[in-house]
Every structure is written in structure tokens, then in C-alpha cells.
From Swiss-Prot:
Membrane topology: Peripheral membrane protein
Highest taxon of the lineage: Bacteria
Name the record gives this protein: High frequency lysogenization protein HflD homolog
SUPFAM superfamilies: YcfC-like
Keyword GTP-binding: no
Record-stated family: Belongs to the HflD family.
Organism the protein comes from: Shewanella sp. (strain ANA-3)
């Protein structure tokens, strides 16, 4: 298996895994603690030696690979809403990587959260609120806001709002890595078969 394509597909799976949780939260108001932790932990790995260092929860990653197959494959599983969120994240990522001040501020704020983890778990409400505020303060202002669809009663709850923003930050982290590994939007069209084949093989690892 081509290692660069494998790593890139891993990062793309990370984006989709975070986005799918956003969708589920918006509709149902609840999240799987392990999946949430897996996505949020990726935000804090800022100097990885490999993509595998970022995605250490293999069960969560496998869900991401399945989402890659659903979204890029010729199946009825393709989800237009997931695609819309993906397009929004990739557009914001382009703006973030062009903003030196935004990147510097992001690094500093993530360091603050890392220090907080000496005392709290990654899924603690205060930590989630801080990750959400990073998204609101730095990412959200870069371009058009991503409009989240779902159950209005769920979306009104502050903890749900915080989790959604924290997960969008996790999706952004994976999008940055995907781009650093050479990912381009045109690959999702012209290299679709190679990405699907890589995701299928990765599911067996």
C-alpha cells in the first residue's frame, strides 16, 4: 500500500469521523464518549512523527474508513449533509493555513488546553467548552459559518453546542493534516478509486 496515500486517507477518515459525530449530536443531542474522546484527542497532537500518532483509537478510525467508503463509493450510503459539512471544513482550512496570526493563536490556545488536561479528562465539560471557544474565536471568523442542521431542541443546549464546535475543531485538525500530506479536493473526484481501495485495505489492518 502506498504509504503517503494511506496516511492521507487516514486523515480524511478523521475528518469524516468528526463530522459524522456533529451530525449525530445535532439530531439526537448525545454522543459516544469514546468516539468523542478519539476525535478531540487528535486536536492535541500538534507535532506527530506520523499520521498514526494522531489517530490512536483504531475502532474510531475504522468508523472513519467506513464513512470514506460511504461518501466516495457508488452506494446509497452517500450523505449530502456530511458532504456539505466537509466542503465547509475544507474551505475554512484553506483560510486558516493562509493566516499566520490565526495559526499562532490556535497553537497557543491548544497549548493552554493541553495544560488543563493535567487536571481534567478530554471529555470534561470545561475542556470541551474551551475547545469550542477556540473554534468560535479563531476558526469561525475565517469565512462563512457552517450551518448545522438538526433537532432545534438539541441544538439549543449549551453542552451540545460546545461539543459540536469542539468536533468541528477536530475535523479542522484532520483537514490541516490531510492538506499537509498532499490532500487536494480534486483527489476526491479524480483519485476516488485509489482512496476507496486504500480505505478498504485499511479496514483489514
Amino acid at each position: 500500500m502506498n504509504e503517503q496515500l494511506h496516511n492521507r486517507t487516514m486523515a480524511f477518515a478523521g475528518i469524516l469521523q468528526a463530522i459524522a459525530q456533529v451530525q449525530h449530536l445535532a439530531r439526537h443531542g448525545e454522543s459516544d464518549t469514546d468516539e468523542l474522546a478519539a476525535s478531540l484527542n487528535t486536536i492535541l497532537v500538534t507535532d506527530p512523527e506520523s499520521a498514526a500518532d494522531v489517530y490512536q483509537d483504531k475502532a474510531a478510525l475504522h468508523k472513519g474508513y467506513q464513512l470514506v467508503l460511504n461518501q466516495l463509493g457508488d452506494s446509497s450510503q452517500k450523505d449530502v449533509e456530511i458532504t456539505r459539512y466537509l466542503v465547509g471544513i475544507l474551505a475554512l482550512e484553506r483560510k486558516l493555513t493562509r493566516s499566520n496570526s490565526g495559526l499562532a493563536m490556535l497553537a497557543e490556545r491548544i497549548n493552554q488546553v493541553n495544560r488543563q488536561l493535567h487536571h481534567f479528562a478530554i471529555t470534561d465539560e470545561q475542556v470541551i467548552a474551551n475547545l469550542a471557544s477556540i473554534y468560535s474565536d479563531i476558526i469561525s471568523n475565517l469565512g462563512p459559518k457552517i450551518q448545522i442542521s438538526g433537532n432545534p431542541l438539541c441544538l439549543q443546549r449549551p453542552l451540545v453546542q460546545h461539543k459540536i464546535r469542539a468536533l468541528l475543531l477536530a475535523a479542522m485538525r484532520s483537514a490541516v493534516l490531510w492538506r499537509q500530506l498532499g490532500g487536494k479536493r480534486r483527489h476526491l473526484v479524480f483519485a476516488r478509486k485509489a482512496i476507496i481501495d486504500t480505505a478498504k485495505k485499511s479496514l483489514t489492518l
